[in-house]
Design a protein with these regions (language model features):
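A short, Lys/Arg-rich alpha-helix, primarily the initiator
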Residues: 2-23, 61
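DNA major-groove recognition helix of helix-turn-helix/homeodomain DNA-binding modules
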Residues: 2-3, 53-73
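Short, charged recognition helix plus adjacent turn
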Residues: 7, 69-95
Length: 95
């Protein structure tokens, strides 16, 4: 759980977490269990108090990649948008 400043022009990671949960239909508790973290960690990420660790970001990216294979067009489109916004340069660009 790394505390990083957001780079200018970079979308906040809290948006990424909320959107991924919305796309997957998972509660904060369910999302936490999927990533192997505590519920309070997800809550802190979404509220901008903490940033996900590099390992968590890797897992989040894998979840988004899996959604790009969905038969549901909206899931594919939204997951691709999030991948481009947050992971187009590298995991270290997420902030």
């Amino acid at each position: 759980m790394v505390k990083n400043k957001v780079a200018p022009g970079q979308p906040k990671v809290s948006h990424l977490i909320r959107e991924l949960r919305r796309l997957t239909g998972l509660s904060q508790e369910q999302f936490a269990a999927t990533l192997g973290v505590a519920f309070s960690t997800i809550n802190r990420w979404e509220n901008g108090h903490m940033q996900p660790s590099p390992l968590a970001l890797k897992q989040i990216k894998m979840m988004l990649n899996e959604l790009t294979c969905s038969p549901v067009v909206e899931l594919v489109e939204q997951s691709q948008i999030l991948l481009v916004q947050y992971f187009s340069l590298s995991e270290s660009s997420v902030g």
